[in-house]
Design a protein with these regions (language model features):
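Membrane-embedded alpha-helical segments of integral membrane proteins
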Residues: 36-81
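Short, Lys/Arg-rich N-terminal segment immediately upstream of the first membrane anchor
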Residues: 24-38, 82-83
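Short glycine-centered helix-capping/turn motifs at secondary-structure transition points
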Residues: 58, 158-161, 293
Length: 307
């Protein structure tokens, strides 16, 4: 009589602590779903983090540097995290983060800039023309700060009597509001320096190679061979060699930069990351240009000009 309630009580306790056989698969499936969802979210976050790092060093080409690039990196990261390559994705992020730490905390970028930037001594006799290279555009019809720095440096050389005429290259970009051409803002800026500057612009270009070819078509038939090329500091080596490859005798002039980076980067992360990213890009682009025969193949002493 006294044992039955105890057995009943034990039976009730067991029924509360042990799930039924039918409930196990459902809870397991729910756990799996949660784990998979967490991995997908983690992968997406890793993908976006990689995009941020590459964006900071300006190594994202074309549309990847624009708004769709963020979503694409997130989706790729989520897909990779849901597959067997998720460890590889994490390793890539760790390596990228390590590079950022090294670049921002050491003078590596200053060393790279000192060894890479080409700055030729300007000839006492001057040059026939100075070519200011283009860069990016803004939707409000203005050229970006990099292109502005090139143009101002070029105008200064002409005003100082070191060049007879100014040549600018022409780029065009399409925005939601319509197409924007660099000549619109270039003409505004040239006019601010007075109307005495002899200024001509090339036809549209899409690359440094195009800039060299269009400038050659414009200047060489008129006998203009000795020129100065104004470019962003880390771009000088490839740009000036590309102009030499089409027949010019070039004096290379690194522009003074008002934005991050420059010939002598500051000790803050923005400058160091910008210079490092430019160096990585220029090394790859220089190799591609050399493989295609678009760079000057002059004697070694010309390639080893003082930096």
């Amino acid at each position: 009589m006294n044992r039955q309630p105890a057995e009943g009580l034990r039976h009730d306790k067991d029924s509360l602590s042990l799930p039924t056989a039918a409930g196990v698969p459902g809870k397991l499936r729910e756990l799996i779903r949660r784990v998979r969802l967490a991995r997908i979210i983690e992968g997406g976050a890793i993908g976006v983090a990689l995009w941020c790092i590459l964006f900071a060093v300006e190594l994202l080409p074309g549309i990847l540097s624009d708004t769709p690039g963020v979503l694409l990196f997130g989706l790729v990261g989520a897909a990779a995290q849901a597959s067997r390559v998720r460890r590889g994705l994490l390793v890539i992020l760790v390596l990228a983060a390590a590079v950022v730490v090294v670049v921002t905390q050491t003078p590596l970028s200053n060393i790279l800039a000192a060894r890479w930037v080409r700055a030729d001594q300007f000839p006492d006799s001057g040059v026939s023309a100075v070519v200011a290279l283009s860069a990016g555009l803004n939707p409000d019809t203005t050229i970006n700060s990099e292109a502005l720095d090139h143009l101002i440096n070029g105008l200064e050389l002409v005003r100082a009597g070191k060049a007879s005429e100014l040549v600018t290259t022409t780029v065009e970009e399409r925005f939601p509001a319509g197409a924007v051409k660099s000549t619109v803002d270039q003409s505004r800026i040239v006019s601010l320096f007075g109307g005495n500057t002899k200024w001509i612009s090339t036809s549209d270009v899409k690359s440094t190679r195009d800039e060299a070819l269009r400038s050659a078509e414009l200047l060489l038939p008129t006998g203009v061979r000795r020129i100065a090329v104004v470019a962003s500091p880390m771009h000088t080596r490839r740009a000036c060699s590309a102009f030499e490859a089409v027949g010019f005798e070039v004096t290379c002039v690194p522009a003074r930069m008002r934005s991050a980076g420059g010939q002598d980067p500051g000790p803050w992360p923005a400058d160091r990351l910008k210079v490092f990213g430019d160096w990585v890009y220029e090394v790859a682009a220089t190799a591609r240009y050399r493989a295609r025969g678009w760079l000057d193949s002059g004697p070694p002493e010309r390639a080893a000009r003082p930096l």
